[in-house]
């Protein structure tokens, strides 16, 4: 989760993949409204049947048309049955909670509510209501977002030492309590940060502490005796006792040393991975799965978790700023069914929903002009390839591992040219998304204040790594075909490739993601490439993708803070978010990557090196660079290397569409996709 994954993953069905917007469906709503939905569905089914009969009569004119119509009628009937089933399930579901609280639905069951382990946007939103970090996101009197002190008395400037390291000293506020009444201490933060960064926990966002002195020692590894499935040695720590350079000077004073100055440190302090946890609480590995063992220090406590249904948060009277919390109860309903969400919103049962059916977008803009909201968001929706997926045809004469990878890089880049991104955003997304030609998202600034993405790719005539304009579709297609013909048999009569290996596209359950998958499938089928579609429930999907058990998968990333590095450091070999598997498995020893930094005053020049010898080194140089202009040039080189692999196929830059009932006042959201309800009222 980054302030990208929390700004991801990932947002959900309405084509905004916020990494935590999909998962198991949950029951909610109820009563006459759901019965009416069933009746409406039945009427729709009758109308569909009549339409099918009329179509059948028309189809008698030609056998071919009749067959096509029959297939369409079958699909319509199946869709009608599925809609009826959803409506029936909704009708039978438990009614919305009547506890005087605010009912909202962000996504399905979160994978975890442990701050160190969460990597989804919906989970981050809940954690922001449950924990208090040293800093937080807030609105000023003009409604502008800013980072302000939270558990810390103030956010002081760092002191730069002769060695270039930066020391920050924080004083905790008086009166800080855990939800069980015990005092919050500086040692709680020290423990939590070391736990999140630890080698043993291997948290997805552990690398968020890479800026802290000592992190490099924790992750300094050597080959161990055990081997993985590919026969490669499993890394072990050289220094098992290594810790972050953060200390509790006393119960209320925290001192932390950064390896070098960074501009986004305060934003990291507001990130959920930096939230405190207590050692005696988390010693129970299941602590974060049940309200009876869940101890936190934020505005709310968890009072109920009906798994796959609803999580109830109740105002924490031990919270130091409890007097400012205006909403006594928040009910987070759990669902990945956009139709179910919309039904409950229209019924008035849920006052905010973070996903809407794609096919309802245009009508909702007209019907709910003040409640259908499309907010800005710094993120990228993309397709990722598993770098270890074999793409060359059976019997290919290319066998050297490095040459195989170079060929597959070219193949992936070619396939990425076959997609019409304008069709995806205009006909499927319909929420103001912008076609993407680079990975670092629109909204990230460059060293001179311009947009980082506008300076990507170093191409004349267009921005980014390929031309996404409608005018370039034919040229892109022709270029892709010429490349693919180098590696595959092509039948001129059918204009299709005949020996491209079958692919499988993995996506998390959502109608929006499915529609995009179906479009990608059709674009490849047009040239003879078969790509099957496979959907999984959110938590299963995350695990499958993380483990590299896929060939191609849907993905998305939201900025974690306002610096392009949050889109780039996730792809280092050891990163918990390296779903592409760069530098892992078979790719660990493949020497197919090149890097030249001599034009920026560095000695680094690698021709045909491993991922660790090139990309990992480059990210390390970026993290230690103190010259701002050079640092940004290094980040452009990192994106160049990343995009040269073809493993990242950006489709569009995100927007954040959601529905908020006009009765809710005091709500705000940040650019990371987090939504804040603690200061709301219902009028």
Task: State the predicted function of each range.
Residues 105-163, 295:
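N-terminal lobe/hinge region of extracytoplasmic solute-binding protein
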Residues 106-128, 151, 204-205, 265-275, ...:
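A structural "hinge/loop" feature
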Residues 137, 314-319, 379-411, 418, ...:
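A bilobed periplasmic-binding-protein/Venus flytrap-type ligand-binding module shared by bacterial periplasmic
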Residues 139-142, 222-233, 237-243, 247, ...:
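Gly/Pro-rich hinge or "lid" segments in bacterial periplasmic/extracellular proteins
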Residues 153-211, 255, 344, 401-407, ...:
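Aromatic- and charge-enriched surface segment that lines or borders ligand/interaction sites
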Residues 303-314, 331-394, 422, 426-428, ...:
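Extracellular/periplasmic solute-recognition and catalytic clefts
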Residues 405-522, 526, 637:
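Append "and occasionally in soluble cytosolic enzymes with long acidic Gly/Pro-rich linkers
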Residues 416-455, 511-521, 544-683:
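Detector for C-terminal structural segments
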